[in-house]
């Protein structure tokens, strides 16, 4: 797996950027210069690609301890694949930053200058002063306000290899391509269409037990206002329109450091429940509001590639505007779950809970949907005609054909002449076209590109 290292002097926002990219609070962040002195690592996803993100200690010659940190940072940088050098956009460039940057540039690796804390027009004007670093790749960010990250991700994506996010997916696809005959319909795995497994997840005290009780219309789980009352996962089934929906009520996920004893076991059990679920109800507290822990749990759902419905519970107590809230979730907090429907309910009063049952059936139908190969290829043909594939350094890029090779979740292979040239933005365009035509609401859609006549996903 390729690695991305964040380097810079203390207090430029490395840990904040690390947490933002990792979608969870791992590194300690504060306004005190030099809070992070140890190297932190975590695996991240940038679009359809994986990478190891490394948060280095701050570089500062003025502190004896930091001399060792700098030495270790440079060592890690030599072993990394991509370097992001952070500076503080509130301050003018200094020679020390330039020296650090030039020493890293000599390593011959992809390197970008990231100017953080660019929060307003005045900061943008000041950022021009960093042009004398002599680097083409400069990105203005405001990590605090989540501004500028999309451009940075787009640049990083160019240097990352295509990897599947689902375990063993590589082997599954290669086995499929070995025996698949172009133009033929594929015999999919059998999925029980009459039994749906639904995991209910969320942080502590968002109302998961109350929601379960409302869904099955009986007091099955112990409901209390005390945070973390439900410890043991509880299964309950309900028949809706001749379909058996099996619900699992999970223990709430607490913040790190507060997980003790049975609660720690329950967190591990939540992972297991998701691994055996097909659809997740991600429950949020619309009265209390959302936080970074909600994002972490959402990331857990995305990691398992489940169908998902975002449930805004306690809506009767909320003062939020529904449309603005949905926009915030899809464009900011949960960009990676933008395909998920959002439903507001009040579990205690039972208001709008019935809507969830119909929506679960619909999402499950999308989750197990089979696209006819001829219809899929007609769509791809029309999409590429409307917006032709960009050339790859002057060479023509072609999609020979497309085929769905799995379901639950749906997975589509694009057989191409130059699969590595398929930019993530064009892949996203194709995903949007497929979603629009075949209705994949609430469902992750996996698209893989492969070279025709080869098991390799490159041009060699």
UniProtKB/Swiss-Prot annotation:
* Biological-process GO terms, alphabetical: ribosome biogenesis
Stretches assigned to the KH-like domain: 369-453
User: Which residues does GTP 1 bind?
Assistant: 8-15, 55-59, 116-119
Domain (EngA-type G): give its ranges: 2-164, 196-368
Q: Which InterPro entries match?
A: G_ENGA, GTP-bd, GTPase_Der, KH_dom-like, KH_dom-like_a/b, P-loop_NTPase, Small_GTP-bd
First and last residue of the signal peptide: none
Which amino acids does the record list as binding GTP 2? 202-209, 249-253, 313-316
Assigned keywords, A-Z: GTP-binding, Nucleotide-binding, Repeat, Ribosome biogenesis
Query: Gene3D superfamilies this protein is in?
Result: 3.30.300.20, P-loop containing nucleotide triphosphate hydrolases (3.40.50.300)
Which Pfam families would you find in this protein's record? KH_dom-like, MMR_HSR1
The source's superkingdom equals Bacteria
In its UniProt record, a GO molecular function of this protein is:
ribosome binding
Q: Which SUPFAM superfamilies match?
A: P-loop containing nucleoside triphosphate hydrolases (SSF52540)
Subunit-structure text: Associates with the 50S ribosomal subunit.
Task: Name the job this protein performs.
Answer: GTPase that plays an essential role in the late steps of ribosome biogenesis.
The entry's family comment says: Belongs to the TRAFAC class TrmE-Era-EngA-EngB-Septin-like GTPase superfamily. EngA (Der) GTPase family.
Q: Which PANTHER family match?
A: GTPASE DER
> Any idea what this protein is called?
GTPase Der
The species this protein belongs to is Campylobacter jejuni subsp. jejuni serotype O:2 (strain ATCC 700819 / NCTC 11168)
Q: Which gene encodes it?
A: der
């Amino acid at each position: 797996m390729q690695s991305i290292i964040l380097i810079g002097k203390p207090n430029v926002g490395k840990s904040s950027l690390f947490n933002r990219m990792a979608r969870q609070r791992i590194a300690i962040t504060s306004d005190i210069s030099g809070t992070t002195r140890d190297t932190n690592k975590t695996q991240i996803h940038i679009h359809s690609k994986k990478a190891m993100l490394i948060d280095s200690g701050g570089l500062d010659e003025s502190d004896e301890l930091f001399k060792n940190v700098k030495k270790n940072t440079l060592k890690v940088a030599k072993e990394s694949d991509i370097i992001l050098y952070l500076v503080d956009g509130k301050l003018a460039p200094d020679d020390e930053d330039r020296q650090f940057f030039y020493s890293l540039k000599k390593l011959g690796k992809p390197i970008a200058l990231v100017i953080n804390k660019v929060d307003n027009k005045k900061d943008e004007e000041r950022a021009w002063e960093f042009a004398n670093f002599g680097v083409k790749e400069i990105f203005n960010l405001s990590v605090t306000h989540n501004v500028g990250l999309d451009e940075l991700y787009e640049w990083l994506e160019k240097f990352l290899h295509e990897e599947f996010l689902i375990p063993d997916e590589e082997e599954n696809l290669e086995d499929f391509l070995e025996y698949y005959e172009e133009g033929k319909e594929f015999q999919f795995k059998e999925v029980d269409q009459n039994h749906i497994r639904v995991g209910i997840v969320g942080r502590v005290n968002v109302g998961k037990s109350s929601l379960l009780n409302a869904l099955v219309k009986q007091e099955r789980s112990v409901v209390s206002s005390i945070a973390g009352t439900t410890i043991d996962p509880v299964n309950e089934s309900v028949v809706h329109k001749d379909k058996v929906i099996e619900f699992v009520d999970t223990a709430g996920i607490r913040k790190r450091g507060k997980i003790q004893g049975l609660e720690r076991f329950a967190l591990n059990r939540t992972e297991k429940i998701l691994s055996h679920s097909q659809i997740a109800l991600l429950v949020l507290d619309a009265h209390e509001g959302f936080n970074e822990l909600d994002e972490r749990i959402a990331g857990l759902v995305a990691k398992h590639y489940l169908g998902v419905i975002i449930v805004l519970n306690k809506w009767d107590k909320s003062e939020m505007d529904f449309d603005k809230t949905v926009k915030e979730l899809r464009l900011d907090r949960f960009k990676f779950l933008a395909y998920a429907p959002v439903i507001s309910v009040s579990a205690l009063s039972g208001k709008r809970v019935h809507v969830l049952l119909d929506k679960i059936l619909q999402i499950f139908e999308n989750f197990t949907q089979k696209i006819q190969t001829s219809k899929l290829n007609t769509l791809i043909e029309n999409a590429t005609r409307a917006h032709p594939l960009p050339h790859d350094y002057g060479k023509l890029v072609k999609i020979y054909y497309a085929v769905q090779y799995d379901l639950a979740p749906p997975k589509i292979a694009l057989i191409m002449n130059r699969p590595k040239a398929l930019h993530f933005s064009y892949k996203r365009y194709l995903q949007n076209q497929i979603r629009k035509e075949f209705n994949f609401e609430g469902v992750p859609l996996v698209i893989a590109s492969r070279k025709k006549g080869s098991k390799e996903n490159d041009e060699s």
